[in-house]
Amino acid sequence: MLETRCKYYENEAMFHGFIPHIMGTRFDILLIHSDIDRLNTLWADIAYELERLDKILNRFDPHSEVSKINNHASQSKIQISKEMKSILQLCSYYYETTSHLFDITLKDFSQIQLHEHSYISFTSPDISLDFGGFAKGYALKKIRKFIEQENISDAFANFGNSSILGIGHHPYGDCWKVSFLNPYNQSL
């Protein structure tokens, strides 16, 4: 069972949802709206979706779909879900358009074989899938759709300070302010 927390700040019409451990990090979201019931429902949908995606993409969970692929695809063709097939096709597109810099195999994406009827195999036993550089961004795109479907115009989501989504405005300003350290000068 996924541990989640949330709190509504009535004066600001701000909802804060928090998951301490999902996809290898923490997740926070701020949703600005006055309808608390609507926000609670949206939060439940978001938390459910994050847990669902974690069960597909978390290579550290031995029961996840990616773990099953990593454990068996070098030995024989195995069937994958339609969503996993779509994710792999998207990752293949990123692999090609980045001149092979984006590679979820950490070796050579070309050694993944996608077969008809949603089957996958690896041509080498050294290949495994790691969605660490992909899963949080993919999840944020899904979350954005949930937020837009509810016509929430102001929201901010943060995955462990490495992947963020800002929509609209902060309740006390023109935008959601973000900052990050300059890796070449930590004093800035």
Regions found by a protein language model. Name each.
Residues 1-188:
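Mature catalytic core of soluble alpha/beta enzymes
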